[in-house]
Amino acid sequence: MPPKSRASGPKKTQKSRRRDKKNVPHGNAHIKSTFNNTIVSITDPNGNVISWASSGHVGFKGSRKSTPFAAQLAAENAARKAQEHGVKKVDVFVKGPGSGRETAIRSLQAAGLEVGTISDVTPQPHNGCRPPKRRRV
């Protein structure tokens, strides 16, 4: 019996992913700001993501990801990509305790998006998980 060749089987062709332009005039901006990073997602009213950016995606590494400036650049990047899909007005949902919350909202406005409502959706535990121990510096 001849040995099996590894190249047998159907060839996989690379399928090019085409970005179709969605025309969504109104969307939601979800800003998740943690102690280590800030993630900005802009979605349509159904919750499907139109564009996103994070501090790490913009090019920051390590402790610089948690700065307000990194959050500002991430929000500008996400807003620019969303405007290509026709987004003009957003409602903002902010989650988390991080330092980039207000800066991200301001930079969404500065990028040309009209901000409607701003709501804080940070989850509050009803005495759930034990929090991490306090740092002694």
Swiss-Prot record:
Organism from which the protein derives: Nocardia farcinica (strain IFM 10152)
General function of this protein: Located on the platform of the 30S subunit, it bridges several disparate RNA helices of the 16S rRNA. Forms part of the Shine-Dalgarno cleft in the 70S ribosome.
Annotated GO CC locations: ribonucleoprotein complex; ribosome
UniProt protein name: Small ribosomal subunit protein uS11
Gene Ontology process terms (BP): translation
InterPro entries membership: Ribosomal_uS11, Ribosomal_uS11_bac-type, Ribosomal_uS11_CS, Ribosomal_uS11_sf
Assembly notes: Part of the 30S ribosomal subunit. Interacts with proteins S7 and S18. Binds to IF-3.
Pfam family, one: Ribosomal_S11
GO MF assignments: rRNA binding; structural constituent of ribosome
Family the entry assigns: Belongs to the universal ribosomal protein uS11 family.
Region span, Disordered: 1-32, 118-137
Keywords: Ribonucleoprotein, Ribosomal protein, RNA-binding, rRNA-binding
Biased composition (Basic residues): 12-21
